[in-house]
Regions:
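Active-site segments that bind and position negatively charged phosphate/pyrophosphate groups
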Residues: 41
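Glycine/charged-rich beta-loop-alpha catalytic/anionic-binding loops adjacent to active sites
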Residues: 53-64, 88-92
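Short acidic-glycine loop/turn motifs at beta-strand connectors
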Residues: 51-53, 128
Length: 153
């Protein structure tokens, strides 16, 4: 498992608990897909974002006839968490009803980078019965645009 490879010293008991927690977060992302408003693409996406203190916020995609005004599941989850006062996050799970290994798009990755460190764990659903593919935000979005990037000298 990728998580074990990164930490190297996690006990089997802790790894099993982490796997259960990851599956639980993925289930939250899968469950919220049913609330998606997708009359045009019929492509449902769900996201579950866990705060540093363990609270979970979910989001689904909301399409608009003018596609540029559509909201992505990750954006909705982030907005819910931020409006509730959260600014530190530990994990994100993303799931789609149409394809396995769905990852956040570039725009969502940049939005996540506004609030999350490069080590945010991103769990990408591989479908029922499969282990999720795990990335860090830094792996998905290297060389992010940040406040430091925009500072003038």
């Amino acid at each position: 498992m990728l998580l074990l490879a990164r930490t190297g010293h996690m006990s089997a008991e802790n790894a099993n608990e982490s796997d259960r927690d990851d599956q639980s977060l993925l289930e939250r992302a899968r469950d919220i897909q049913s609330a998606a408003h997708v009359p045009y693409s019929e492509y449902r996406v769900g996201a579950a974002l866990e705060t540093a203190d363990g609270e979970v916020f979910v989001g689904c995609n909301l399409e608009n006839a003018n596609f540029s005004n559509s909201l992505h599941a990750e954006e909705v989850a982030i907005a819910e968490a931020v409006k509730s006062g959260h600014r530190e996050f530990s994990r994100l799970a993303v799931s789609s009803d149409r394809r396995d290994a769905v990852t956040p798009c570039g725009m969502c990755r940049q939005t996540l980078a506004e609030f999350c460190d490069d080590d945010l764990r991103v769990l990408c659903d591989e479908g029922d019965g499969e282990e999720p593919t795990e990335y860090t935000l830094g792996e998905l979005l290297p060389n992010t645009i940040s406040e430091e990037t925009l500072e003038s000298e």
